[in-house]
């Protein structure tokens, strides 16, 4: 391609730095051959000297690799239109160094144990590698020159498009620009894939996206400017788009040449919060022997103050609620005091070989305060996300509607609201990044947020232009293009923020917010406030839709099974039944308020459907958390402990939870409950031993057994004041879930029993199924008895012990029945397979496959925290007699 304008290459032709994978790959064969050729021992051998046939073969390989590179270099030199002299000189240098290596290598192969000859070969090999590298780097520069020529060609057409004076020239120039963009994008993509630097690859990818996105916008805006040259906002939009395109061209030019673009603005201090918390938690556990106040105190205090500064930024954010601001401040003060107490204890223990109990207590307290502050920050951020991303497009739609109707006076107010809305979205997105460790997700969030910031003033200018020319079709088209672009990046930002946010935290906070909105709805209805009722109902619909969307997306990442089916059943119930019923009731209420006929409205029916939508959200959250570990459940439980909201529709949100009341039982009752729980855990260990050997990917019986086991464990945790179940209604719901799982297990096991040809085996399996049905019903009764516990005179009545004991006993009996059912189902399945295999293939009800053992490394890798350890002496080899090994072997326990 001939360049009309000289292309300036900002690359040093003498620089041997390899920037691309292609050059690296071309050099690799030569490096391997040369390295193998000169790879001989440092100390010469005393053996008889002789010629090495292997070395001569390697020398031939080096020559072959060199000549292959020379052939490619000569082809490039013939086709090149630039750097011809440099290429010719580089080729000559490679030939010269190749001959020098050949001479020194032949001498070396005659006497491979003579060190001076070896050193001569090494020097010649290095010179050859340097010459070849320079040749390949020059060839790479020619590729860059080709790309820059396309950039220059696009630049010229781009300048022509900016200055067109009529629509025919505009259309012709835009078509030419489209073709050149296609060629430029292809070459830029190739360069992007070839560059070794991840940051430069990302820069080119972003620039390519900017060119594709802004080129159609430029055409539309230029067309509008030709029709309405007197509209200043159109000219401002055109200047902004042109600046974006020019910046993208500069980025491609610089990144392809390895030039660092303008440094990105420093991340806000809050962006380091997550890693700062991790570092602080790792540093608070020290050895008293090595602690000195001069080193430890300034270091820990500096790190803590950095965290508190970031927390203060979050607390002062316009999105932060007053309640959370106060709690963040309180936790900051508490962690400051905990650190001072910890440092005081360290100074008291200086020089001691072991930590005292008070020091250990101070360390535990500091860790707890760190977790508490982290939790408060996380809650505040989730609050912001839940509120800000509730309805992301309404401000834009209102702005566009005002512009279409030509309401110029209102545009400024709506533009200010839209600008504030954009700023809030960007601020909340950055806050979400501050506590996340998902680097890829954070990168996507920041890119999308930057695009929204750039689009905001352009959209406002487009709206101003539309307001001044509401009947112009080209201005309408421009506004529509901006709207689609905005909606695209809003979708990207929302998905990215959801991706870096814990779904458990989001569901817990969303449940709380929906309860607040439900209360606002009921208050507004009773106060006959139609505006607040409509606003709160809209918030409920938006939050419920967000919950359904996020949970459905989360389930897409799981293999279909009992877990996903249970979750999606609740989600579908929410979207297909509950939300439509709620919308209907809200419309009825609003209609009644507008006609002043509130007396004809059934107030209780509205309260019931409002409570139903909250209960469904709670059910979705419980079903999502069914597979969580006890530690994860406890963390989410802590997230909610101080997030209780008093409900006007349910007395259960007043005062302490029933779970908290269980901790106030007399010590004698607690001991008896602990004994019952210990017996239950013994039975649980039997079930664990029975199901842990089976692969549950195609065995729903094992899946259901695990699920029932987990729910029963949660119910027993409730009796000790722990776990995710907070109210007696949760216990009743858990018993209902167990009953449903038992019914599904009954269906599967009965299919196995019906196919089993062994009557005794079939009879035993059916008997165990009857036990599951009986004990499931008993468990439901016990959970309902527990719900009747009352608080009289500030103390729990004595019958609580009997209720709890009955609950745990029923759970233990049910667990035993599940254990026996799993065993007998497997036995019956084996009989079906053995007897009916000769009659032809038959699909089994479930597949009984042994679980594959966990993968273990052949060589134990040293843990990062153990890298400081001194070199240890190898343990002495010890012979163990086989009889001793056999005597210590213990198989799986049979119950």
UniProtKB/Swiss-Prot annotation:
Has UniProt tagged this entry with the keyword Phosphoprotein? yes
Listed InterPro entries: Alpha-catenin/vinculin-like_sf, Alpha_catenin, Vinculin/catenin
Q: Name one GO cellular component term.
A: cytoplasm
The listed locations are: Cytoplasm, Cytoskeleton; Cell junction, Desmosome
Alphabetically, the GO molecular function entries are: actin filament binding; beta-catenin binding; cadherin binding
Coiled coil stretches, renumbered: 74-107, 325-379
The family database entries (Pfam families) matched by this protein are listed as: Vinculin
Q: In which tissues is it expressed?
A: Expressed in heart (at protein level).
Q: Which GO terms describe its biological process?
A: bundle of His cell-Purkinje myocyte adhesion involved in cell communication; cell-cell adhesion; regulation of heart rate by cardiac conduction; regulation of ventricular cardiac muscle cell action potential
State the residue spans of region: Disordered.
635-660
Q: Which UniProt keywords apply?
A: Cell adhesion, Cell junction, Coiled coil, Cytoplasm, Cytoskeleton, Phosphoprotein
Q: Which residues are reported to carry the modification Phosphothreonine? A: 361, 649
Q: Which family does it belong to?
A: Belongs to the vinculin/alpha-catenin family.
According to UniProt, the name of this protein is Catenin alpha-3
